[in-house]
Amino acid sequence: MSDDIKVLGISGSLRSGSYNSAALQEAIGLVPPGMSIELADISGIPLYNEDVYALGFPPAVERFREQIRAADALLFATPEYNYSMAGVLKNAIDWASRPPEQPFSGKPAAILGASAGRFGTARAQYHLRQTLVFLDVHPLNKPEVMISSAQNAFDAQGRLLDDKARELIQQQLQALQLWVRRLRG
């Protein structure tokens, strides 16, 4: 097994000016040596429907499942809607977790989020963590990255202006790297 750690970044927002997608872009520039981040595109994943699933996985779902299988770790960026993760993210997780095999099982993960509110996606992250634990994903506990007042933390081009948030993302990536190595044995 290679020492390089391949991380799959998954944004729970489809919005073109998404603060969460911007945070993932920022993370790409902050990865420690020996780590890389590839971004998943979940925009083509249809709403989960058992009738469609009975016919097989749609191509966008199969691509997403393959990206999960190929990754050493996962980095989720979720907005918060109504005290929870975004529906589009939950939908992608629901599709990817269907049998016969479970691509999420045993994967280390980290969660970050950005929100215009003052709690910075705290509730969404805890809800996402609960879902991931059920899927046998191993979420990193600390540091937590919850970017509040995102409209002030990012500029119009999506660059993160908040030095503390940038430092937390960098620390989280370093901790994720150590977590992956620890779980590898």
UniProtKB/Swiss-Prot annotation:
Top-level division of the source organism's lineage: Bacteria
EC number annotated for this UniProt entry: 1.-.-.-
Top enzyme category: oxidoreductase
GO molecular function: FMN binding; FMN reductase (NADPH) activity; identical protein binding; NAD(P)H dehydrogenase (quinone) activity; oxidoreductase activity, acting on NAD(P)H, quinone or similar compound as acceptor; protein homodimerization activity
InterPro entries named among the record's database cross-references: Flavoprotein-like_sf (IPR029039), FMN_Rdtase-like_dom (IPR005025), NAD(P)H-dep_reductase (IPR050712)
Residues given in the record as FMN binding sites: S13, L14, R15, S16, G17, S18, Y19, N20, Y81, N82, Y83
Annotated keywords: Flavoprotein, FMN, NAD, NADP, Nucleotide-binding, Oxidoreductase
Coiled-coil portions: none
Family annotation (Pfam families): FMN_red
Entries under Gene3D superfamilies matching the protein: 3.40.50.360
Protein function: Has NAD(P)H-dependent FMN reductase activity.
Family note: Belongs to the SsuE family.
The protein's name in its UniProt record: NAD(P)H-dependent FMN reductase PA1204
Provenance organism: Pseudomonas aeruginosa (strain ATCC 15692 / DSM 22644 / CIP 104116 / JCM 14847 / LMG 12228 / 1C / PRS 101 / PAO1)
